């Protein structure tokens, strides 16, 4: 499976925007002034850590909107489509890296059980 991350702000081509407004968007931000309603965390790393916990919770509790978005990306990637997740952070650390990790980790079953 090929999953890449592209920077939307820089005009890099992407197949799927995963920023705020998308079911997989990060509800946490280290940017206090431009958070667009996101919950503030002191650093980028803490915002990504909080996102990892949030995404794990969504999967474990079978949030259909989130789980279906992950399933769709995994099925398309398994089918040979090159997935390019669009965000505004790349190449800096980003929640899209967590999304890619969860999709590629086939031990994680979206909706049935969660090993992570």
Give the predicted meaning of each segment.
Residues 1-116:
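Catalytic phosphate/metal-binding cores of nucleic-acid and nucleotide-processing enzymes, i.e., regions
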């Amino acid at each position: 499976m090929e999953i890449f991350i592209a920077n939307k702000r820089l005009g890099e081509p992407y197949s799927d925007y995963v920023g705020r407004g998308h079911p997989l968007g990060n509800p946490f931000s280290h940017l206090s002034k431009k958070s667009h309603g996101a919950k503030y965390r002191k650093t980028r790393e803490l915002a990504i850590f909080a996102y990892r916990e949030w995404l794990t919770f969504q999967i474990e509790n079978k949030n259909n909107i989130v789980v279906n978005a992950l399933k769709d990306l995994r099925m398309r990637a398994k089918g040979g489509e090159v997935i390019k997740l669009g965000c505004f952070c790349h190449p800096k650390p980003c929640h899209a890296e967590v999304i890619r990790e969860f999709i590629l980790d086939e031990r994680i079953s979206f909706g049935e059980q969660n090993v992570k």
